[in-house]
Amino acid sequence: MIQMQTELQVADNSGAKRVECIKVLGGSHRRYASVGDVIKVTVKEAAPRGKAKKGSVYNAVVVRTAKGVRRKDGSKVRFDDNAAVLLNNNGQPIGTRIFGPVTRELRTEKFMKIVSLAPEVL
């Protein structure tokens, strides 16, 4: 469950290390985002020679949450951290690698690239 001012780890090699959610996209008063939702983030910490610079604003898709995702069979998938993947204006990932597992809920037409780059899909 991600809301405004939540800090997330970045699960790609775009150069950003840590980002902060500044808006949950999709609806005028939407409060929370979960896995697969797109949020607006600002970069709080970045690698020296990465594509993403500190202070820049991007769209990102949430790939892991500590709150977890409930499946239709009653099981729940939780993670140790909250993580996101930065997106460009076309909705494609900025990085060329994804670190850590992602959930099967990302397997939609928009985010198949992220699922194919991920080392593990839960």
Curated annotation (Swiss-Prot):
Record SMART domains: Ribosomal_L14 (SM01374)
GO CC, alphabetical: cytosolic large ribosomal subunit
Assigned keywords, A-Z: Ribonucleoprotein, Ribosomal protein, RNA-binding, rRNA-binding
Gene Ontology molecular function: any one: structural constituent of ribosome
One GO term of the biological process aspect: translation
Transmembrane stretches, start-end: none
Pfam family, one: Ribosomal_L14
Subunit structure, as described in the record: Part of the 50S ribosomal subunit. Forms a cluster with proteins L3 and L19. In the 70S ribosome, L14 and L19 interact and together make contacts with the 16S rRNA in bridges B5 and B8.
HAMAP family: Ribosomal_uL14 (MF_01367)
General function of this protein: Binds to 23S rRNA. Forms part of two intersubunit bridges in the 70S ribosome.
Family affiliation: Belongs to the universal ribosomal protein uL14 family.
Name of protein: Large ribosomal subunit protein uL14
Organism from which the protein derives: Francisella philomiragia subsp. philomiragia (strain ATCC 25017 / CCUG 19701 / FSC 153 / O#319-036)
Top-level taxonomy: Bacteria, Pseudomonadati, Pseudomonadota, Gammaproteobacteria, Thiotrichales
